[in-house]
């Protein structure tokens, strides 16, 4: 809640908080809703500015800095210089053995969501004795609903499934909080 409150206060302070454009539509690029993209979304996010693409990426503080830190499922937000925002979603495995996952099953309190990937959709790398595999996607409405279910769940297990191996990740409560914070902030953009 503090994440959202600070974000709304940030927008209201500049007089740029509007629910819709004057013509009644909800657009990211109408002048009334455009916000200064260089201003922070929240102090609870990590801001990464891409000077070449002129995009700011906002990631929750729970987002690992190093690729081989831990496995996770987390969304993040991109905002361009025109104030247009979009959501991204990362499924990330790291460990000491390759999974070569092609499928992810997310079990949210017993309800399963399944995502299939082609071999080349998954990025893979290694270093310092660790391996990591991940996909970074534009989430569908179903994916966003799944993220909300994860955040509200008692237990969520994410299975990274390959042909011969799999890895089960239990989503931490800190990641659940990060998920809902990012989704709530995104819904205000």
Model segments located where?
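A generic "folded-domain core" signal
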Residues: 3-18, 25, 29-189
């Amino acid at each position: 809640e503090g994440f959202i409150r600070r974000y709304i206060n940030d927008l209201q302070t500049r007089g740029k908080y509007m629910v819709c454009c004057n013509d009644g539509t909800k657009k990211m690029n109408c002048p009334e809703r455009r916000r200064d993209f260089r201003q922070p979304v929240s102090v609870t996010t990590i801001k990464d500015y891409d000077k070449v693409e002129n995009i700011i990426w906002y990631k929750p503080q729970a987002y690992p800095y190093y690729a081989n830190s831990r496995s996770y499922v987390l969304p993040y937000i991109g905002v361009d210089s025109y104030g247009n925002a979009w959501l991204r979603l990362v499924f990330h495995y790291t460990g000491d053995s390759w999974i070569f996952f092609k499928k992810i099953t997310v079990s949210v309190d017993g309800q399963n969501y399944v995502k299939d990937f082609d071999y080349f959709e998954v990025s893979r790398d290694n270093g310092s004795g660790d391996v990591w595999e991940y996909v970074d996607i534009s989430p569908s409405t179903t994916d966003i609903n799944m993220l909300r279910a994860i955040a509200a769940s008692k237990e969520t297990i994410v299975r990274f499934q390959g042909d011969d191996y799999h890895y089960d990740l239990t989503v931490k409560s800190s990641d659940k909080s990060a998920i809902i914070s990012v989704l709530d902030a995104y819904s205000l953009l």
